[in-house]
Amino acid sequence: MKENKIRKNKEFRHVYRRGKSYSNRLLVLYICKNRCNINRLGVSVSKKVGKSVTRNRVKRLIKESYRLNLDKDMKQGYDLVFIARNSSNDKDYKDIESALINLLKKAGIYN
């Protein structure tokens, strides 16, 4: 799972510049093709969302939603960066999961 993460600032910038964006009321998704056979995930939560406890909770919810839906019919070979919006700070798991699946369907990589 370690190789499936986007960690470096340079990698995030590449996805922001070269990728296409999709958004809804809770999340923003930037997606860009990579040269691997796997999807790589990056999560970004601004300080506007709340204090560190809230930001980390939102990050955990996004990562867990992605992990549980990873084995379903999802196309491979993409870099995905999810950005949490301010309205996501008080949402529960089901809300985050439905927003995440909605964005993946908009991007055309989730069937």
Curated annotation (Swiss-Prot):
User: What keywords does the record list, in alphabetical order?
Assistant: Endonuclease, Hydrolase, Nuclease, RNA-binding, tRNA processing
Write out the GO MF terms.
Answer: 3'-tRNA processing endoribonuclease activity; ribonuclease P activity; tRNA binding
Question: Which top-level group of life is the source organism from?
Answer: Bacteria
Choose one Gene Ontology CC annotation of this protein and give it: ribonuclease P complex
Q: Is-annotated flag, keyword RNA-binding?
A: yes
EC number(s) per entry: 3.1.26.5
Catalyzed chemical reaction(s)? Endonucleolytic cleavage of RNA, removing 5'-extranucleotides from tRNA precursor
A Pfam family of the record is: Ribonuclease_P
| TM annotation in the entry | none
By what name is this protein known? Ribonuclease P protein component
**Organism of derivation:** Clostridium botulinum (strain Loch Maree / Type A3)
